[in-house]
């Protein structure tokens, strides 16, 4: 990877993060409005995921260009965890001191975004020995690489993402159990469920990276981890369609469009898991085409947002999903840079 491209792939997630920050801040501060109290904080804190993806990109790229100093393997992933902690804390603060139901929704969703950020930061941590993956892949033997992670470290990394995912799922269930207290708990619980799907998808990414670094990635991993991500994306997408159709005429049904966007983020994550599976100890002619997946999902998010912006001129219920989908499109494009880095790092050319 040449120096210019390495800079570009690190700049992309940072630029996307700041687009979310500025757009979210503009939405929230422009007018004091209920819909903006939901969309503003959510779009703003989606930028946290972009910063965590920057940490992942920087961790891998610095190894590829041979500038990954020992101290950086702690500082860069640590930065991601700090961002995740601040995001979760901000979400809890928002709904903890909520003046109305709008802030209750945005607070819970922001906390869920923080859980995703923590999962992405764990992916950055698991990538601190990424340089071993090409060597292990080229080696026909299946012996454990002693330079890789210990079995305990591998299990801790996978366990962390599992913990964050379970937290998101339990959180979603608790919110949905409170639907009787108000429709806003349905909205918050549904979106938290979609965020939980993304966290679960990231288990597959962390497990794939950690296992390939240790050279314990087997045929069952090659088959099952990509399936897990695709299932999560399908669950979120279909969940969104069900909400849209089953709640037609209800303002809450527009939440379904956000769920569809979250499903598209899962499909973006699948590009990385599929790439790692396809090129492990074998050649895959279409490996350099896999980065197109997050580009397509980003475009789908933005096109869907455009339709909802138009619909929002006549029905304010579409205000929130239109803005949130723009933020999700930015996250999908961040994932394009990550899968491109992975493709470059694992290429056998």
Question: Where in this protein do the model-derived segments appear?
Answer:
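Short, charged juxtamembrane terminal tails flanking transmembrane helices
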Residues: 1-3, 137, 342-349
